[in-house]
Regions:
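Mid-to-C-terminal functional-domain signal that highlights helix-capping/loop sites
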Residues: 110-200
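N-terminal domain-start signal
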Residues: 1-114, 124, 198-200
Length: 200
């Protein structure tokens, strides 16, 4: 399965059966067969086996676990990577919406850094996610794709607002906004420059 539309995000954000603490986040995923298989696949990233990564399998495993088994921030990180690595504007925007939705729905509850004991670790993980997002955004190309550019920008604006509300590190998001603006489609950039000239 590949995420290509907003409707595909809904099962990922929906609650799961409650655990022993009454939190609707399903079961612990670590050490499950799917979790270990996903970890093994993503360990290839950045290694000599990078070109052998089965991104479709990794994405399917992550979707299945988050939708049907348990909410886990490490699995979320892998899924975000799957959505972002191609430089596809639509899927990149969906990755930002997914992260925003998770912050709203189950970020503070999810394994393995759930509850008060994970309060210091979750911001670090968020920073790791956003730093990688910034790095992968370099591959985006919005030439003749103004709709994709606007989708990414609007999604990022919502994520920035929510990150500020939750006091999460946002430096990479600010840099990402500057990078997106640099990648603004030419016709849109020319219009913005023209408006700026008229205003002066």
């Amino acid at each position: 399965m590949r995420i290509t539309a907003d409707s595909h995000l809904e099962p990922l954000l929906a609650p799961l059966p409650a655990n022993e603490q009454g939190e609707e986040i399903g079961v612990v995923l670590e050490d499950s067969a799917d979790y270990l298989r996903l970890e093994a696949e993503m360990m290839k990233v950045g290694s000599l086996q990078h070109q052998d990564v089965d991104w479709d399998t990794a994405e399917t495993l992550a979707i299945t676990m988050l939708s049907h088994k348990g909410k886990d921030l490490k699995v979320l990180g892998h899924l975000l990577h799957c959505l972002q690595h191609e430089g596809n504007g639509v899927r990149f925007a969906l990755s930002l919406r997914l992260l925003t939705g998770c912050l709203e729905a189950w970020w503070a509850l999810a394994y393995p850094f759930n509850g008060a004991r994970g309060a210091k670790l979750r911001p670090r993980l968020f920073q790791q996610f956003t730093q990688r997002t910034l790095k992968l955004a370099a591959g985006l190309d919005f030439h003749n794709a103004e709709d994709e550019f606007l989708a990414c920008r609007h999604s990022l604006e919502k994520l920035q607002t929510l990150a500020a509300d939750k006091q999460l590190p946002a430096d990479s998001l600010d840099e990402l906004m500057r990078l997106l603006d640099e990648k603004q489609p030419n016709q849109n950039r020319a219009a913005s420059a023209s408006q700026g000239g008229d205003a002066s």
